[in-house]
Amino acid sequence: HTHHPKHSFPTRRSSDLNNSIYTKWYPSLRNLDTVSIYEKYGIFSGQSLTMSNIPIAFASAMASAMIPSVAQLIAARDVKGAREKIGLAVKTTMVISIPCAVGLFVLAKPVISLLFTNKTAEELNLAAALLMTLSLSVIFYALSTLNSSILQGLGKVNTPIINAGISLVVQTVAAVLLLMFTRLDLYSIAIANTLYSGMMCVLNQWAVRRAVGYRQEIVKTFVIPAFASAFMGAAAWAIYEGLYIVTKSMRISVIPAIVIAAVVYFVMLILMRGITEQELRSFPKGYLLVKVAKKCRLLR
């Protein structure tokens, strides 16, 4: 996949800039102890950011799988086919990234404790709260990654880089202003990061729309996955809290909560007619999902 370095370049720049602003400029602004600043930034980048990148990486892998076919359709002058393909790619990305974002928001603390052991309560709370702040960026990054891949497939190689540059300016201004005028401290960086991803998402989406005159279907792409994810989030939280009362262990409680939540989401998505059998088949291991759904009488 030739396009990955191109996308990760601006994203890397985004973290480098955040790092410099928070660890170099901010301590001198507020006369703070640099050691604790570096420690806090380490928790942000090493745990919260790392965790939010997992679903984004998954979405990117699916995005890169779609690109050759979009490029072929455009080369064959089949704009209608390309639009359909793009629509399906965006929908697939949303169906996966919206529940991931909700799941990370609801189960931030137990998920961090599951992956990063031996943390003090204070570190755990900070990492979890930062992850909650970043959870929305999962959706934005997943969509902007997909759209920048599509733009490359359409031959607009520079557009995503220009958009990333614009977003970087927005992020930097936001980070500096928040650090100067609020007491949000490290949360300023998490908010600025989410703004960066949101800006990238909007600019890339516009560029794709301009390139192929394409309009995204809204209800099944965004609304139904969001509703199903809200149900799923409530279920995940209730199951986790219930198990935690009994087991007193975050790690033991979180795994069943994640598994049951995934099932709830899948069932809700199908019941609300958010996904068709054909779309389900285009998922990784889709034929298995269809088989299970038919066994459980969810699909006719």
Residue spans for each PLM region:
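Membrane-interface junctions at transmembrane-helix termini in multi-pass inner-membrane proteins
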Residues: L136-I166
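Interfacial transmembrane-helix starts/ends
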Residues: S45, M66, D78-V95, P99-L107, ...
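Membrane-proximal transmembrane or re-entrant/amphipathic helices at the cytosolic face
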Residues: A238-R300
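Interfacial segments at transmembrane-helix termini and the short loops linking adjacent helices
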Residues: F105-V138
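Membrane-interface helix-loop junctions in multi-pass transport and translocation proteins
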Residues: N158, L168-Q205, Q216, A234, ...
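Short, small-residue-biased leader/transition segments that mark boundaries at the very start
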Residues: H1-S14
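Alpha-helical transmembrane segments of polytopic membrane transporters and translocases
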Residues: E39-A59, K91-V95
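Helix-loop junctions and terminal segments of transmembrane helices
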Residues: I56-R77, S148
